[in-house]
Amino acid sequence: AAVSMDKALSKQLFREGGVPTPYGISLKKGQLLPQDVSYPAVVKACNGGSSVGVYMVNDRAECEKALAQAYAYDDAVIIEQYIKGREFSVGVIEGKALPIIEIAPIEGFYDYKNKYQAGSTVETCPAVLDEALTKEMQHYAELAYEVLHITSYARLDFMMNEKNEMFCLEANTLPGMTPTSLLPQEAAVMGYNFN
C-alpha cells in the first residue's frame, strides 16, 4: 500500500512495467518550477488521497499557486500532463480486473467533493466501451496491480483521450467502501458483497 500511496514511485513503476501513464515530473519543496512544463497540467501531492491536494492548472502562475497549496499536504509533488477525455476506474481483486466503471462528473472534475457527494457524478458500470478497449484497460489495470506488488484489492484510475489512448493515473489500495464508492459498485456487478 505504501508504494501505491507514493504517486511518483507508482508512475516510475508503471513506466518500467509497461503501464501507460501521463508524462510527469516530480518536485520537492524548495525546488524551482522548470520553465518547460506544458499546460494544462495537473499538480498532485505525492502522498494525497481522495483527490486532496490535486489541482488543475492552465499556466505558470496557476501552477506556482497550486504548488504552494499542494506543499501544505506533502513535501513532494508531481506535475503531470493533463489528459482530456473520459475517466474510468477499474477495481482489481486478487489480480483479476472487475467490470470497468466510467465516472462523469456533472461539473468540474472528480475531486474530493464529487467523490463523496451522492448525485455529483454519473457512474456507468459496466462502462460503455467496445470489447477490445475493455480488455485493454482491464489488462493495464491487472498489470499496474502486479508492478506495484499489490496482493489484495485496489482501484486503478484511468483517463482515455479522444484517440482511445488510455493512461493509468494512479492506484488506490485503500479505496472507499461507502455506498457511493466505486469498487463496491464494480464488485456488485460480479456478485461480490462487502456487507
Predicted regions and their residues:
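Glycine-rich phosphate/pyrophosphate-binding beta-alpha loops
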Residues: 51, 106, 172-186
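Short gly/pro/ser/thr-enriched loop/turn and capping motifs at secondary-structure boundaries
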Residues: 1-3, 107-108
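Short, intrinsically disordered, charge-balanced linker/junction segments flanking boundaries
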Residues: 1, 22, 191-195
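Conserved metal-phosphate-binding beta-hairpin within the catalytic cores
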Residues: 81, 92, 145-177, 187
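Active-site nucleotide/adenylate-binding loops and adjacent lid/helix of ATP-dependent enzymes
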Residues: 2-86
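Short, well-ordered amphipathic alpha-helical segments that serve as non-catalytic structural scaffolds
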Residues: 140-144
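Phosphate-binding site of ATP-dependent enzymes
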Residues: 58-139, 160-167
